[in-house]
Curated annotation (Swiss-Prot):
Superkingdom of source: Bacteria
UniProt record similarity statement: Belongs to the ATP:guanido phosphotransferase family.
Naturally occurring in which organism (per UniProt): Caldanaerobacter subterraneus subsp. tengcongensis (strain DSM 15242 / JCM 11007 / NBRC 100824 / MB4) (Thermoanaerobacter tengcongensis)
InterPro entries in the record: Arg_Kinase, ATP-guanido_PTrfase, ATP-guanido_PTrfase_AS, ATP-guanido_PTrfase_cat, Gln_synth/guanido_kin_cat_dom
Designated name of the protein: Protein-arginine kinase
Lineage of the organism: Bacteria, Bacillati, Bacillota, Clostridia, Thermoanaerobacterales
Record's GO cellular component terms: extracellular space
Record gene name: mcsB
Binding-site positions, ATP: 11-15, 76, 110, 161-165, 192-197
Enzyme nomenclature, EC number: 2.7.14.1
Length: 337
């Protein structure tokens, strides 16, 4: 069993939605008001007398290339919506990529903390610390009865969105995935693909999060998500165990073929990589393959279109990307540590 349940949980995320008092929401504010929010955020973090002031790098969307913006989206450091806000979109990203503060997305501020494995409490502690630091210099839009005021009604209240990214290959192979996801939806959780709302569950990877933030404390919301995550972890592990016991040869064949193609292919699309990666990741946690799990998880971000082009330092058309992706994956998987 891996530390922090990393065999099933890829990452844990806490995101806090906050708005500045007396400034209209980003959907209706002027460009000047957007610039004011940026200055307030800069002062709160970069101007603070804490060690944190030296640990963040600022990113103005208008100064980034489309490729740079997309690379940040692929790393889950900014949202697709923020990447499209060229006029007033801005982000402060911690140098170790664990925290990002998105400015002028759907809300004035979205404080996000992402950590590997099941670490919701640690993610919350970090996000809460940043939130407190910002609140020292910014007056938030807050109502005594309702809580934090947000652009979208589903975020009103605590303004917290807690989520886990889970890899569920065995539940998918055994046909149990629909029942599991339906059960999760019925208890008020949202289920999305790897890049959030409206995205596909590529590579059997799903994002589970709370839907509503009103009427519950931050602690209750986090405990609910953690409880659901632990049930899903148990179901997936049980499915893996039964699958390997009943279909050992077929699973070893499936994993071996997937690894063979990943490590030797000459052309590979993102979608094909994600499908094969899912089988290889299953093979690693079942002990069939001795590939480093963290290395494979890093690779899954590195081979996404924008990050791949940044690694090679050149613009590539779709076919060239598929060739370079196969080359990069092969090099990484065949490299002796």
């Amino acid at each position: 069993m891996l530390q922090y349940d990393k065999d099933v949980v890829l990452s844990s995320r806490i995101r806090l939605a906050r708005n500045v008092k007396d400034i209209p929401f980003p959907t209706v504010m002027t460009e000047e008001q957007g610039k004011k929010v940026i200055e307030l955020a800069r002062k709160a973090i970069l101007g603070s007398n804490t060690i944190l002031s030296t640990q963040f790098t600022e990113y103005e969307m208008k100064k980034l290339t489309p490729l740079d913006r997309q690379a940040l989206v692929e790393k889950h450091l900014i949202s697709p919506d923020l990447s499209q806000n060229i006029k007033t979109g801005y982000a402060l990203i911690k140098d170790d990529n664990t925290v990002s503060i998105m400015v002028n997305e759907e809300d004035h501020l979205r404080i996000q903390c992402i950590l590997p494995g099941l670490k919701l409490d640690e993610s919350w502690d970090m996000a809460d610390k940043i939130d407190d630091l910002i609140e020292e210099t910014i007056d938030y839009a807050y109502d005594e009865k309702i809580g934090y005021l947000t652009s979208c009604p589903t975020n009103v209240g605590t303004g917290i969105r807690a989520s886990v990214m889970v890899h569920l290959p065995a539940l998918t192979i055994t046909g149990q995935i629909s029942n599991i996801l339906n059960s999760v939806s019925k208890i008020g959780m949202a289920v999305r693909g790897i890049y959030g709302e409206g995205t596909q569950a590529l590579g059997d990877i799903y994002q589970i999060s709370n839907q509503v933030t009103l009427g519950q404390s931050e602690k209750e919301i986090i405990e609910n998500i953690e409880g659901v995550a632990k049930q899903i972890i148990s179901s997936e592990r049980r499915a893996r165990e039964e699958l390997y016991k009943k279909q050992r040869v077929q699973i070893e064949d499936r994993v071996g073929r997937a690894f063979g193609i990943l490590s030797h292919a000459k052309v590979m699309s993102t979608k094909e990589y994600m499908t094969l990666m899912s089988d290889v990741r299953l093979g690693i946690v079942l002990g069939i393959l001795s590939v480093d799990l963290d290395k494979l998880d890093r690779l899954t971000t590195q081979i996404q279109p924008a990050n791949l082009q940044k690694i090679y330092g050149m613009q590539l058309n779709p076919y060239e990307r598929d060739v370079k992706r196969a080359e990069y994956v092969s090099t990484q998987l065949n490299k002796k540590e």
